Design a protein with these regions (language model features):
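Bacterial Sec-exported substrate-binding components of ABC uptake systems
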Residues: 2-7, 12, 19-53
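A short, structured surface patch at a secondary-structure boundary
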Residues: 44-113
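Alpha-helical transmembrane segments and their juxtamembrane interfaces
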Residues: 14-15, 74
């Protein structure tokens, strides 16, 4: 058991530098076969899903959230202050026009349907 824990820890220490490497710009990502290149971190993000909103809040990126939607409950206690001024497009599915009207540089959606 001790050997397994030691190997696991050694593996983590080996890959940790890559996991925490700084992002370089421009950054190209591919999603669903479509490539998108960002020359800088997106400053206007719309989240379609509470999970995505919580991730951005946990990363300290609340100022980048232009608007949010699709909420299922209250924010976890550690995120309440960061999320208190968020603009909600809808508690459920927002319209395409509502999302596009925010002029987002990035839309994060929890389901492919959105």
């Amino acid at each position: 058991m001790l050997l397994k824990k030691g190997l696991f820890l050694a593996s983590l220490l080996t890959i940790a530098p890559a996991a925490f490497a700084a992002t370089t710009w421009p950054l190209t990502i591919e999603n669903c076969g479509v490539k998108q290149t960002f020359t800088q971190p997106p400053q206007r993000v719309v989240t379609v899903g509470q999970h995505e909103t919580e991730l951005l809040l946990a990363l300290g990126l609340e100022k980048t959230i232009a608007a949010t939607s699709v909420w299922f409950g209250k924010l976890p206690a550690p995120l309440v202050d960061a999320g208190k001024n968020l603009s909600r497009l809808a508690d459920n599915s927002p319209s395409f026009e509502a999302v596009a009207g925010q002029k987002p540089e990035l839309v994060l959606a929890q389901y492919h349907w959105h």
